[in-house]
């Protein structure tokens, strides 16, 4: 048997109460059996009735005092105990009716005992208004059962008095029968009643005094208010009425608890991210937009865990089983997908690492750099009100510009500085692999990129992939939807604007228009790339413009420019189907001597003009002579020509150009960005001389602002 159960069922605890019950019930039974019948005949029949009523009252109060809860306080639970430190003071003082009363800390129940409360060592509980522990009733006497205990004492005293008195009366009436059984039993009951009368009567008198004074047995024995004022007394009559007539005190143990279920969602808990659609509302540069994108929980956690210094992971391959709606779109770009997915895409810049890659449609939003650059160009077909407004209102995905509007450069696209020299070789290798995928239909005639509606917005749409990749910068408009727009009427280009970027498809179309069809065995002439002056200051550009005006005022009487060669906004990319592009720094070109052959150190011009506009430098071949065959370029693969054009074997034509020739090429395209007139918007008329035709093979030095000297071949 457990120790707690053994302690609860100790026989010694029940000996006093059992003896009291036996003596009470036994003596009364003998009284009613042997004494009451003679008294009812000799004295009055009311005697047994009176004794029966008193006895029942005694039994009722005895039962209530024994089995009733005295007012036990429940023990504090562990979580409540944590609020009070073990180093807390042993006593706390409260004021009751202007008198300081101490409350002692109960180490067993773990709370400060209220006033007049004490811990019972027998019951091991704190009892409200603890009086004493009575072994005769085997219970503590407290606030809730003190009334019944007090009435039990009063009724028991009266009952003992009645039993003893009515027994003595019976003996007096039957003096002749003292040897009889009835008289002998009556005398025995009288002895028992007399024995219990003295202590019970004394205890009853003591509690009568306590009730009249408003004290408890514990307070009286311990001398709590000895020599002082009792703050709990309300007068004799009020104290008696409070004990006998007040409403019963509430019970603290075993109260039915109504459990209420309350769902609490603290603000610091984030909701679970499901694999559904997440609506993202962003606000950048004053433009608001709501985008929907399917993004899994795992991808969000990876993005949040990455630091700003860590390198971004390579873009994932598209999951065709999950994005079933993309299969039809992916069939249009099978060739470039197969060539690009096998290679590592260029790393994403750090400032765009945490930008989610959104696109114009929800279906193609989860594609990596290459596929999303080809499948999500629908927004690029929407024409802005004007180029000037589009330059003042950058794309809502672009990085916000911190420059005031009055100090911004007139050139467009400066929000993303891009150096075509350092990244030319890498982007060229990627674009040449994609070249065959671009030829989906007959090439249309396009005069300038500024004449289409995709001038600036198409470039800004490339940043929706979340990064400025090489493909998105070099191919701003290579979607199938873009081709359908090209067949329509071409509006006049706005003045002072030429896009610094041109797609590989546009370059292919312009190359097909510029050059006549070559023989199958003939080498393909090289088309240089246009010049970007985004990084030059305004003063340098102004000096170059003045030199350009001088060149236009003195056109040569010799070669006339063909109608299709007046476009200066052409950027010859490796995917254009002609000469491959290999970039080299300006320092390398300056260090290379003229005596080195192209085979020993091939130096390709980074910028240039069409063949009709290119001046004859020291190392440039004659127009009529075929270019020397220098071997196939290692970085690029051959591709098919447009329909109707015989296939030509692509060779690397890399003539030597001195730094002077480079300056000449830069001068020819000095007005490509932000100038009053665009020299590449339309071909010149039949009577108009070419804009930048060279006059002679000499070189002139022009001094610019800041002491900079430019060598321009004229």
Curated annotation (Swiss-Prot):
It is a multi-pass membrane protein. Phosphorylation regulates association with endocytic proteins and its subcellular localization. Phosphorylation by LYN during fatty acid uptake leads to inactivation of the activity. Autopalmitoylated. Palmitoylation of the C-terminal tail regulates stimulation-dependent plasma membrane motility. The modification Phosphothreonine is found at residues 294, 303, 348, 350, 411, 436, 658. One of its GO terms (biological process) is lipid transport. Residues 104-154 form the DHHC domain. Keywords: Acyltransferase, Cell membrane, Immunity, Innate immunity, Lipid transport, Lipoprotein, Membrane, Methylation, Palmitate, Phosphoprotein, Transferase, Transmembrane, Transmembrane helix, Transport. GO terms for cellular component: dendrite; glutamatergic synapse; nucleoplasm; phagocytic vesicle; plasma membrane; postsynapse. This is Palmitoyltransferase ZDHHC5. Residues 388-398, 445-478, 667-678 have a biased composition (Polar residues). GO terms for molecular function: palmitoyltransferase activity; protein-cysteine S-palmitoyltransferase activity. Its EC number is 2.3.1.225. Residues 359-373, 422-432 have a biased composition (Low complexity). Belongs to the DHHC palmitoyltransferase family. ERF2/ZDHHC9 subfamily. The modification Phosphotyrosine is found at residue 91. Residues 35-52, 170-191 are extracellular. Residues 683-692 have a biased composition (Pro residues). The gene is ZDHHC5. It catalyses: L-cysteinyl-[protein] + hexadecanoyl-CoA = S-hexadecanoyl-L-cysteinyl-[protein] + CoA. The DHHC domain is required for palmitoyltransferase activity. The keyword Transport applies. The keyword Membrane applies. The active site is at residue 134. Palmitoyltransferase that catalyzes the addition of palmitate onto various protein substrates such as CTNND2, CD36, GSDMD, NLRP3, NOD1, NOD2, STAT3 and S1PR1 thus plays a role in various biological processes including cell adhesion, inflammation, fatty acid uptake, bacterial sensing or cardiac functions. Plays an important role in the regulation of synapse efficacy by mediating palmitoylation of delta-catenin/CTNND2, thereby increasing synaptic delivery and surface stabilization of alpha-amino-3-hydroxy-5-methyl-4-isoxazole propionic acid receptors (AMPARs). Residues 289-714 are annotated as: Disordered.
